[in-house]
Design a protein with these regions (language model features):
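Conserved CoA-thioester-binding segment of acyl-CoA-metabolizing enzymes
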Residues: 1-61, 100
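Small-residue (primarily alanine) positions within well-ordered alpha-helices
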Residues: 19, 43, 67, 111-112
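Histidine-centered beta-alpha loop that forms part of the nucleotide-sugar donor binding/catalytic region
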Residues: 24, 69, 114
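Residues at secondary-structure transition points
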Residues: 27, 31, 38, 82-93, ...
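Hydrophobic pocket-lining residues within nucleotide cofactor-binding pockets
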Residues: 32, 71, 113
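Glycine- (often His-adjacent) and acidic-residue-rich active-site loop
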Residues: 60-100
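Glycine-rich beta-to-alpha active-site loop
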Residues: 96-116
Protein backbone atom coordinates (compact mmCIF):
# COMPACT_ATOMS: atom_id res chain seq x y z
CA UNK A 1 0.00 0.00 0.00
CA UNK A 2 1.57 3.27 -1.11
CA UNK A 3 0.35 6.83 -0.93
CA UNK A 4 -3.24 7.01 -2.07
CA UNK A 5 -5.05 10.31 -2.45
CA UNK A 6 -8.69 10.90 -3.23
CA UNK A 7 -11.06 13.70 -2.41
CA UNK A 8 -11.99 12.23 0.98
CA UNK A 9 -8.95 10.35 2.36
CA UNK A 10 -5.18 10.52 2.06
CA UNK A 11 -3.60 7.15 2.85
CA UNK A 12 0.08 6.35 3.32
CA UNK A 13 1.86 3.23 4.58
CA UNK A 14 5.44 3.88 5.70
CA UNK A 15 8.21 1.23 5.67
CA UNK A 16 7.73 0.56 9.41
CA UNK A 17 4.14 -0.58 8.85
CA UNK A 18 2.41 2.57 10.12
CA UNK A 19 -0.67 3.27 8.04
CA UNK A 20 -1.90 6.89 8.18
CA UNK A 21 -5.46 7.50 7.07
CA UNK A 22 -6.09 11.24 6.92
CA UNK A 23 -9.65 12.58 6.69
CA UNK A 24 -9.40 15.16 3.94
CA UNK A 25 -12.49 17.33 3.85
CA UNK A 26 -11.59 20.26 6.10
CA UNK A 27 -14.11 22.61 4.45
CA UNK A 28 -16.91 20.50 5.94
CA UNK A 29 -14.94 19.84 9.15
CA UNK A 30 -14.41 16.23 7.99
CA UNK A 31 -18.06 15.31 8.45
CA UNK A 32 -19.05 11.68 8.23
CA UNK A 33 -20.75 11.75 4.85
CA UNK A 34 -21.79 8.47 3.30
CA UNK A 35 -18.72 8.65 1.04
CA UNK A 36 -16.43 9.27 4.05
CA UNK A 37 -17.95 6.38 6.01
CA UNK A 38 -17.65 3.93 3.11
CA UNK A 39 -14.11 5.05 2.27
CA UNK A 40 -12.98 4.65 5.87
CA UNK A 41 -14.67 1.25 6.11
CA UNK A 42 -12.89 0.01 2.98
CA UNK A 43 -9.53 1.38 4.16
CA UNK A 44 -9.86 -0.34 7.54
CA UNK A 45 -10.92 -3.61 5.92
CA UNK A 46 -7.89 -3.41 3.63
CA UNK A 47 -5.60 -2.66 6.59
CA UNK A 48 -6.96 -5.61 8.57
CA UNK A 49 -5.89 -8.07 5.88
CA UNK A 50 -2.60 -6.39 4.89
CA UNK A 51 0.35 -8.13 6.57
CA UNK A 52 2.52 -5.04 6.02
CA UNK A 53 0.26 -2.91 8.24
CA UNK A 54 1.23 -3.04 11.93
CA UNK A 55 -0.78 -0.07 13.24
CA UNK A 56 -3.35 2.40 11.86
CA UNK A 57 -3.42 6.10 12.68
CA UNK A 58 -6.52 8.07 11.75
CA UNK A 59 -5.82 11.81 11.51
CA UNK A 60 -7.53 14.79 9.88
CA UNK A 61 -6.73 17.81 7.76
CA UNK A 62 -7.81 21.14 9.21
CA UNK A 63 -8.65 22.26 12.71
CA UNK A 64 -11.49 19.78 13.30
CA UNK A 65 -10.96 16.02 13.53
CA UNK A 66 -14.60 15.38 12.61
CA UNK A 67 -17.81 17.30 13.24
CA UNK A 68 -19.86 14.07 13.19
CA UNK A 69 -22.52 13.17 10.66
CA UNK A 70 -22.98 15.35 7.59
CA UNK A 71 -26.13 17.28 8.53
CA UNK A 72 -26.58 18.70 5.02
CA UNK A 73 -26.60 15.17 3.62
CA UNK A 74 -29.00 14.05 6.34
CA UNK A 75 -31.34 16.99 5.67
CA UNK A 76 -31.39 16.11 1.97
CA UNK A 77 -32.39 12.56 2.91
CA UNK A 78 -35.55 13.93 4.54
CA UNK A 79 -36.80 14.97 1.10
CA UNK A 80 -37.33 11.31 0.15
CA UNK A 81 -40.96 10.13 -0.01
CA UNK A 82 -40.51 8.24 3.27
CA UNK A 83 -39.24 11.46 4.94
CA UNK A 84 -35.73 10.03 5.19
CA UNK A 85 -36.50 6.82 7.08
CA UNK A 86 -34.69 4.52 4.61
CA UNK A 87 -31.77 6.96 4.28
CA UNK A 88 -31.36 7.28 8.06
CA UNK A 89 -31.54 3.51 8.50
CA UNK A 90 -28.91 3.05 5.79
CA UNK A 91 -26.48 5.71 7.07
CA UNK A 92 -26.79 4.59 10.70
CA UNK A 93 -26.19 0.98 9.67
CA UNK A 94 -23.11 2.01 7.67
CA UNK A 95 -21.82 4.05 10.61
CA UNK A 96 -22.41 1.16 13.01
CA UNK A 97 -20.49 -1.16 10.67
CA UNK A 98 -17.62 1.35 10.56
CA UNK A 99 -17.50 1.65 14.36
CA UNK A 100 -17.48 -2.15 14.71
CA UNK A 101 -14.63 -2.32 12.17
CA UNK A 102 -12.64 0.00 14.42
CA UNK A 103 -13.40 -1.99 17.58
CA UNK A 104 -12.80 -5.44 16.06
CA UNK A 105 -9.88 -4.63 13.76
CA UNK A 106 -6.89 -6.88 14.52
CA UNK A 107 -4.54 -3.90 14.08
CA UNK A 108 -4.25 -1.23 16.79
CA UNK A 109 -6.05 1.95 15.70
CA UNK A 110 -5.03 5.34 17.06
CA UNK A 111 -6.97 8.59 16.61
CA UNK A 112 -4.58 11.52 16.17
CA UNK A 113 -6.73 14.39 17.44
CA UNK A 114 -5.57 18.01 17.68
CA UNK A 115 -5.76 18.98 21.36
CA UNK A 116 -6.23 22.72 20.97
Amino acid sequence: MNIEKNSILNIHLNPEGILRIVLNNPKSHNTLSEKMILSLQQSLDDAASDEKVRVVIIAAEGSTFSAGHDLKEMKAGRLDPDKGKSYFNKIMSQCSTLMQAIVTNPKPIIAEVNGT
